[in-house]
Amino acid sequence: ANLDYDMWLGPAPQRPYNAKRVHYLFRFFWDYSAGQLTNFGAHHLDIVQWGLGMDNSGPLAVEGTARFHKQRWYEVPEWFELTYTYPNNIHVLCGQNNGTRGGVEFQGTRGKLFVDRRRIEADPPELLKQPLGDKDTRLPVSTNHHANWLEAIRAGRLPICDAEIGHRSATVC
């Protein structure tokens, strides 16, 4: 395949060609990304924003810690843990730790929910079997982002994740 590396770099700082700086691994260099937090974070943290009813807002505070590659293969952290504090003292934990659970964990008084792009788990498992009440938050169902976007255009309404919601979810990253 032919790659116009100068075109690919665009407005990013000029760097000598390095195969690690193009797809997929470009995500691990500060010039182009902030690692898995900005790669997958928008997907996971979008669920947080929905679930907490904060699509038009965000966390009040963020605290975290990170570890970088000892060999310095990449620039961004190889491991991180973040704690987001939302109104009403709600805490959301998000992290990446070398192939283990990368996703979002909700902690409540009755247990925990873990959500990633493939699954939802509960501790205790019975939490997932409890029916939702009339006032409980119900998230939109979307099996195909592109189809939802095209349907919204045809119907003249906003998609499940409009530009403002997407912006706020990305900002949380």
Residue ranges of each PLM-predicted region?
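NAD(P)-dinucleotide binding in Rossmann-like oxidoreductases
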Residues: 66, 76, 83-143
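Basic phosphate/pyrophosphate-binding loop/patch that engages nucleotide-derived ligands
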Residues: 1
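Alpha-helix N-cap/helix-initiation motif
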Residues: 37, 138, 159-162
